[in-house]
Amino acid sequence: MATVAAAARGAGARAAAGLRSCGGAVARERPRSGCARRLCSAPAAPAAVDMKSYLWARYHEAKRSTDELVPSIMNNLLNPDAIFSNNEMSLSDIEIYGFDYDYTLVFYSKHLHTLIFNAARDLLINEHRYPVEIRKYEYDPSFAIRGLHYDVQRAVLMKIDAFHYIQMGTVYRGLSVVPDEEVIDMYEGSHVPLEQMSDFYGKSSHGNTMKQFMDIFSLPEMTLLSCVNEHFLKNNIDYEPVHLYKDVKDSIRDVHIKGIMYRAIEADIEKYICYADQTRAVLAKLAAHGKKMFLITNSPSSFVDKGMRYIVGKDWRDLFDVVIVQAEKPNFFNDKRRPFRKVNEKGVLLWDKIHKLQKGQIYKQGNLYEFLKLTGWRGSKVLYFGDHIYSDLADLTLKHGWRTGAIIPELRSELRIMNTEQYIQTMTWLQTLTGLLEQMQVHRDAESQLVLQEWKKERKEMREMTKSFFNAQFGSLFRTDQNPTYFLRRLSRFADIYMASLSCLLNYDVHHTFYPRRTPLQHELPAWSDSPSAFKAPLLQEAQAK
């Protein structure tokens, strides 16, 4: 991810450096004070030069430079099985490892989202009296991505960047994109004010009108919302968007609460659970090095037990020092009142007061404050893994000082796309072209502006192309056109490290230190980046000699 960005930025920045001038001479050295004031200067073309030819010569030289750069980037591709660091962390300091269950210890096949979608759709029809015609809609795994925001009152799904700006072309009402002009009219621009955004946990509450879909289970929910919206719109059915959102949310919730999903998985566990060997290997490695381990999940006891028996074996509880089910995260991390209850071998809740959390036992509910009191596991010696940035990680890192690891399954597929030559070629040229536009915008004559408009058109087309590399509707989970997504902003804040799956831990020893890659800030020299020297693009030379 950072490889192409750093290289492309290096190409653009060095192109810009080669294009800066003072009084017509190329400034290859630090500009003198008088020249430094001319922040938007570009090479002054000789008076007799045809500006159109001059600019296109610059363009083609930059293109050649980009083409020469791509092979060196292809020799330094990112490993999809790597662990990436937002914050320096040494595994030598970690004594206790904690895990969520769903999409952390256990991964599910593509069949699960289809199951959730179909079950929730049928609940809408059978219990909420929605039109039977919506049964024609099937789950489309290629429609939505995680991290999207849904405007509950306007019934539109969208992608928002780290600065609360909507990415144009990613606003959907039903299954159709909303034109940019309509979006701008709707929001009086493209910025979403803080008071309209979702609350701390991504929910639409306390006056917030947007819901952010952060967990992997939300993918079928977004698709179902969009499908039902589409049906109502296509058939001119008058409806209240708030009621629709609530009904879909309740139906998705009931798939879990009523046990529909749990029973289906337990009945055909091989169909739904995958990568069992990898999880088993990670747990065995940590146990062999004497690490303490615990499990805190919102899933029920019998469901977790059957899944872990399939993944690890019937003695799976021997690996964990503490097992907590139906924890009701994120409330588990904030509520100081709910006591733990022991679950016996038959799944019956006992009423004994819990004075100690014993190995081999399963406990229900409880709260983190009591957990800390009974275990003494505090601070940065604890590393907890989960897939939900808010419910699993936010409170732990902000309030309790635990180290946190985010499991982002989409990371592996995105990195594989980013390692393709087509993506690298496109992104490197896009960044270089942006640098050219930045420098050459000072030429205000009509002929130059026509050339710049062509460049802007090409840039817009390329940005749309880069979006479609990942998802035709919404693009990358991690980026909008230019900025990080709101999802990535929260990931960077709440996760010390992140990876595609727990199996990535197998590539590192238990004493490994993760160092965040130093990337240059906007006001820093690109040369300060820690990118390999192979990414140092040559300066663009003057297109015209004196």
From Swiss-Prot:
Its EC number is 3.1.3.-. Binds 1 Mg(2+) ion per subunit. One of its GO terms (molecular function) is metal ion binding. It is an enzyme of class 3 (hydrolase). The keyword Hydrolase applies. It holds the Pfam family 5_nucleotid. It comes from the Eukaryota. The active site is at D100, D102. InterPro entries: HAD-like_sf, HAD-SF_hydro_IG_5-nucl, HAD_sf, Pur_nucleotidase. Its cofactor is Mg(2+). Keywords: Hydrolase, Magnesium, Metal-binding. Substrate binds at K249, D250, S251, I252, R253, D254, V255, H256, I257. Mg(2+) binds at D100, D102, D387. GO terms for cellular component: cytosol; mitochondrion; receptor complex. PANTHER family: 5'-NUCLEOTIDASE DOMAIN-CONTAINING, 5'-NUCLEOTIDASE DOMAIN-CONTAINING PROTEIN 3. Belongs to the 5'(3')-deoxyribonucleotidase family. NCBIfam families: HAD-IG-Ncltidse. This is 5'-nucleotidase domain-containing protein 3.
